[in-house]
Swiss-Prot record, chains A, B:
InterPro entries in the cross-refs: MinE (IPR005527), MinE_sf (IPR036707)
Keyword Cell cycle: yes
Family designation: Belongs to the MinE family.
Keyword Disulfide bond: no
Keywords, ordered alphabetically: Cell cycle, Cell division
UniProt cross-references to Pfam families, sorted A to Z: MinE (PF03776)
Gene: minE
SUPFAM superfamilies: Cell division protein MinE topological specificity domain (SSF55229)
Protein name: Cell division topological specificity factor
GO biological process: cell division; regulation of division septum assembly
Length: 98, 98
């Protein structure tokens, strides 16, 4: 998945729509155990759940690409949504990584 | 933040270390309300919390870049970690976006 094709700017037609794009790349070590669950797949659901808490997402406006290469797994998510789809509430999140 | 410089491949020196890189770009609509909290900042903490649930992260191995441009806000996260830092448990996550 070429990063650039994924993050290509949108046409200016949809003025009242916004776009969220996410790329998650996991570069694995040579001797990482093959049996271990793929980190990207583990993270994908929970990250999508975080996004869905803050943005009302229409299923057909979500593109998800997952690629597992030689030493790298890559997840690409592209979500388009109307301006008012973002929830106003400012949630308080405990910080795990400072 | 140029996507390419962020996702540049690591040197092959650290064979037993892995790397997780995330880029989150939010393309805002021209008339989105200025008073609204920045979506990227809202999502940043919760996504980092999701990652920290599955990877034991050393604080000094986490790089976070946040850029707010004309119509786009971009978050870049780069985490390096040892092979055994990934938790083995395979959590069951409810799916919000299919």
């Amino acid at each position: 998945m070429s990063v650039l094709t994924f993050l290509k700017p949108r046409g200016s037609s949809s003025v009242a729509r916004e776009r969220l794009q996410l790329i998650l790349a996991h570069e694995r070590a040579e001797r990482s155990e093959t049996g271990r669950p793929d980190l990207i797949i583990t993270l994908r659901e929970e990250i999508l759940n975080v996004i869905a808490k803050h943005v009302t997402v229409e299923r057909d406006k979500v593109q998800i690409k997952l690629e597992r290469g030689e030493g790298v797994s890559t997840l690409g998510v592209d979500i388009e949504f109307p301006v008012d789809a973002i929830s106003k509430a400012k949630p308080k999140a405990k910080r795990a990584i400072a």
